[in-house]
Structures are given as C-alpha cells and as structure tokens.
Amino acid sequence: MNPLRVKLDALISKTSLTVTEQQREQLVGYVQLLDKWNKAYNLTSVRDPMEMLVKHILDSLVVSPHLVGERFIDVGSGPGLPGIPLAIMHPDKEFVLLDSLGKRIRFLKQVIHDLKINNVLPVQSRVEEFDPESGFDGVLSRAFASMTDMVNWCQHLPKPNAGVFLALKGVRPDDEITLLPEWCSVTDIKALQVPELEGERHLVILSRKG
C-alpha cells in the first residue's frame, strides 16, 4: 500500500472522523498533486508529503464536523486549504475556493479535474472585489493574520442573519477577540485535536450581532 495512505489511515484512526475508501484515495491524490506542483509553483512551505498529511490534511479535516449548512467559501484558499479536504469530506455541500493568484487557481482546477471533485468552484479574485449571487452559510479562512481583517473584508459574504465566519487559528486568540468590530460577536470557540501536530489549534465561530 502507498506509504502516504498508510500514514493517512493511521492519523484518521486517532480521530472520531468517518472517512470512506474513496475519500481517503482522493485525499492521498491531493497530497500527491500538491507535492508535484509545489516543486515548480511553490504553493506551500511544507515540502514533505508526510508532513502535509498532518499540517494540511488532518488540520483541515478536524473542522469537518463543525460545518453547518450547504454553501461555503474558503477565502485566501491558497492551494485549497482547508477547502479541498473539506469538499472531499462533504460531497453534498458546495464550496467556492477564492484566491487572487492565478497559479493557485490553475492548480485547484487540475485537482478537481484529476480527482473528480464535483462540488468545488475555484475563483480568481480579491475578496473585496468578489460579488457572489447569494450569501454563504459559512465563510472559512486560515489565511488571515487577524480576525478583524477577516470579518471586515468578508462581511458581504455570509447569508444575512444566518451565515457565520469560521476562523482557523493556532492558540486561542483572546487578544484578537477583544479587537473585533462592534457589529461582530464570537458564537463559539472549538479546541481542535490534530493528531501529531505540535501546538494548539482552535476554530473560532463568529457572527453578526442582532
């Protein structure tokens, strides 16, 4: 068996996630494509595919149980993180992957073609210039340095009165929370357990007040 698959299976076994055979094969295929393209396009600073399984795949998958709704957008998706792993886990949900760099969007189009992922739309745009036809149930990002920037730049993206922001962070960002704009409030903070990942991971769920 492919060493990446062996490692992925071992990591998943340390979580409570249910991942099908097809999903596991797609996740391994994604890592293989990321490794191949990374050599020419410098898509991630993580060079070792085994390390990608922990820092990129599992780090994204642990968000999976917390997705409520049908339509999601991954802002500043880069090479598709966390969007591609989450789309693989939720074939019944729609994902828009937004990034401003053409090389990343080209990579994402290759991924969804090669792995036959039918629920992802890659879009090349700056977030402030992206004007969706309708709002999203969840606005995901692990790219923003600050949650204040995230909610300010993305405030036009969630569904009115229903959509939420989902910020993936390291240590619990209490300092950042105090700096959030008046209209935004923290709905929940989830401590995430990522097998073999050093350091803390948290998912901060934010929504518009009122």
UniProtKB/Swiss-Prot annotation:
S-adenosyl-L-methionine binds at G76, L81, V127, E128, R142. It is found in: Cytoplasm. It catalyses: guanosine(527) in 16S rRNA + S-adenosyl-L-methionine = N(7)-methylguanosine(527) in 16S rRNA + S-adenosyl-L-homocysteine. Its EC number is 2.1.1.170. GO terms for molecular function: rRNA (guanine-N7-)-methyltransferase activity. One of its GO terms (cellular component) is cytosol. Disulfide bonds: none annotated. It holds the Pfam family GidB. The keyword Phosphoprotein does not apply. InterPro entries: rRNA_ssu_MeTfrase_G, SAM-dependent_MTases_sf. Keywords: Cytoplasm, Methyltransferase, rRNA processing, S-adenosyl-L-methionine, Transferase. Specifically methylates the N7 position of guanine in position 527 of 16S rRNA. Belongs to the methyltransferase superfamily. RNA methyltransferase RsmG family. This is Ribosomal RNA small subunit methyltransferase G. It comes from Vibrio cholerae serotype O1 (strain ATCC 39541 / Classical Ogawa 395 / O395). The gene is rsmG.
